[in-house]
């Protein structure tokens, strides 16, 4: 939220971008719930007071567009609703390939990367590390089911096999059976997929059941990896914001330190308060150490900005600028202007980082890859071990495997996750009936033949 305020404030001070226009905003928290998201959108469309669909009761200003949501689960129904009214929507989260359909969703754009790019990055990491037998774990919803299948297909195309796709539901007995199956699997690697778990209790339950497995944590889970569940895991994070922007954002936050909204949403969440019981509870829930915050510092987690939000707000502002510039000295009906805005966001192009709003799968993406491990005080620490870069022409993975801290003792070797051991020289693979190609037996080579490479 603070990134939104910072960006709007910066735009309003720029007299060249939107002269004689002041941007404002309404902020609603969807909590990743589609019902809350739709309710919030209808409230904004109706104006203050009771929600009245198809009526706009705001007495001043007009809606330029919507920023959000981060979750595809809530972004999809928002896109369906806003498509009826013709309002521009710019999401700052990962984008389901379904939303790429410009016929169905002409008003939807995103500053986040496409889910398929993340799937490719994970599949190439699995291939690079020589893992051929993995498990995919997701929560039980329609989007996760579709995303899990897409990820499984991508992993298969890169030569590995998926033992099974596990889903966690609201039923504890079902979850126990799923997690017991993970425990018994010969796969050492579990790849998390889709949205994060709904409750902290589910995190701790999963941690207890599969504590010996190595996790691959996608970008969508990055805000939750402080939990001990992710000890010994590999994590993707999108590389964002240069140092100058972080400095500017920090300066902005410190300048409004007396803002009660800022205090409520940030300072009390990460800093010691006068309520010791609350401090103890929050530190236990978030597994994070609080600090005695002064007015000259902020905890790092609170001021590391989301570049996706920053670019989404600027994208909307530049689209509005382009629309107004193309219609100078013309009277434009607000309704017509609203429905034309999406045509101008297609041509928005940022110089500090190449991004094309009109093609969700063409914008270059760069992920940092981290090895997560717990320290003596049980805090999760990260070491950057590599990066993955993706452009329309293809991807590039660079990783230093020697820096990875594995959950198990691997004798300084890369962790193995295979259904079957490599066949030694002199032996060949024999397929098992009904089993995936990664699961096989080894048999002696026929007389007069020999396998000279291990694994053939």
Question: Where are the predicted features?
Answer:
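Extracellular ectodomain signature
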Residues: 1-24, 30-43, 47-50, 55-74, ...
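Flexible loop/hinge segments that line or gate small-molecule binding clefts
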Residues: 93-107
